[in-house]
Amino acid sequence: MNLNLRPKSECKYDAVSLGEVMLRLDPGEGRIRTARSFRAWEGGGEYNVVRGLRKCFKLDTAVITAFADNEVGMLMEDFICQGGVDTSLIKWMKTDGIGRICRNGLNFTERGFGIRGAVGCSDRANTAISKATPEDFDFDYIFGELG
């Protein structure tokens, strides 16, 4: 496939990211290992960029990722929609309900306070995006027709 840069006026998106979006669970001021409740967010290095571009500069953005087709995946899609990022390029992967086929990634992050640094712990084994192949996404359409 030949990628030709086109004028912005011919492109649907200003920026598109490709990568894993995880459900981020934040124990607030507490520790992961002793928390009884968490605040949920979406997050992922590549996704955070397009969300920031959308929120800060009102750019048209999208994310290319894959989710297990279950309630957690739908929650993450909703978080992405709330961030203003287009979700139409998400690949929904069949799941068996127990994570053997695929699952959605989790990230636990403690906030840093004073001299205590932030602490993170990710649970990313067997995630939908890690099971995805290039054939799961129509890159000719994404980079050809959409720009």
List each language-model region with its residue ranges.
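A generic fold-level signal
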Residues: 10, 33, 44, 101-103
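Gly/Ser/Thr-rich helix-start
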Residues: 20, 44-46
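Active-site cofactor/substrate anionic-group-binding motifs, chiefly glycine-
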Residues: 40-43, 87
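Conserved N-terminal subdomain of the carbohydrate kinase-like
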Residues: 60-147
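Residue-level "hotspot" positions that anchor or transmit function at local structural transition points
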Residues: 34, 38-41, 64
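A general structural signal for well-ordered alpha-helical segments in protein cores
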Residues: 15, 46-50, 73, 105
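Positively charged, low-complexity intrinsically disordered leader regions
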Residues: 1-37
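Alpha-helix C-terminal capping segments
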Residues: 41, 48-60, 82
